[in-house]
Design a protein with these regions (language model features):
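Hydrophobic membrane-insertion alpha-helices, especially the h-region
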Residues: 20-37
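Catalytic cores of nucleophile-dependent amide-cleaving enzymes
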Residues: 160-164, 174-177
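Active-site-adjacent mobile loop/cap segments within catalytic or ligand-binding domains
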Residues: 123-131, 170-200
Length: 200
């Protein structure tokens, strides 16, 4: 019994070490790439009052994916909070869809972003698979809007894969509510599989 407890504690520590490393890499890359995209496309300096909306997936009564030890809604909020801190230190004005463990309706998220007149919308998620074999990072955008959505998705995805050496699941199109109903370039990033042993 005691041996099993020690094994579980060691596994929990490995999980948290990996997640912290992944969080750090993804957060830094997200912040840098979002900033670069905004400066390039909107011809502004980093000191302009520019709204970037970060959407930490799930929250409150909607936990998202989990592997028993780690819950998606907690990971996405951690990534979003750290990304916000880096961007704000660089002079950007950042808005969060949620700042704590609260539930926000899916249809309300793009409404919040549009109300803020944001320049970029980034929705952050973690993936899962029933068989535990799914792995890698994938990024989504919608074709219903302009080319800026695709360019933002491709830039963020390319650099995250390059720096993390994670399995590349590609840049894909999807008509998710938060992508279609936002009025600014928007992407949804699946940052890794909580159900895959080496990614969690």
């Amino acid at each position: 019994m005691e041996r099993n407890k020690r094994r579980k504690r060691r596994r929990r520590k490995r999980i948290m070490r990996f997640i912290l490393l992944m969080l750090l890499i993804v957060t830094i890359l997200l912040a840098l790439l979002i900033g670069f995209f905004i400066v390039r496309h909107f011809y502004i300096t980093i000191y302009n009052q520019t709204d970037i909306v970060l959407d930490a997936g799930h929250g409150g009564k909607d936990p998202g994916a989990n592997n028993g030890d780690v819950i998606e809604k907690e990971i996405t909020l951690s990534i979003a909070n750290m990304t916000r801190e880096i961007l704000e230190d660089a002079g950007y004005k950042v808005k969060m869809i949620r700042e704590d463990d609260r539930f926000v309706e899916l249809t309300e998220r793009p409404v919040i972003a549009n109300r803020k007149n944001a320049k970029v919308f980034v929705s952050i998620h973690c993936n899962s698979s029933e068989d535990g074999e799914g792995k890698g990072i994938e990024t989504f955008y919608t074709e219903q809007k302009g080319e800026s959505d695709q360019e933002l998705a491709e830039k963020i995805h390319k650099e995250i894969i390059k720096q993390t050496e994670a399995d590349d699941r590609g840049v894909k199109t999807a008509d998710y509510t938060v992508l279609v109903r936002t009025k600014m370039p928007a992407v949804l990033i699946e940052t890794g599989f909580l159900t895959y042993s080496t990614e969690c």
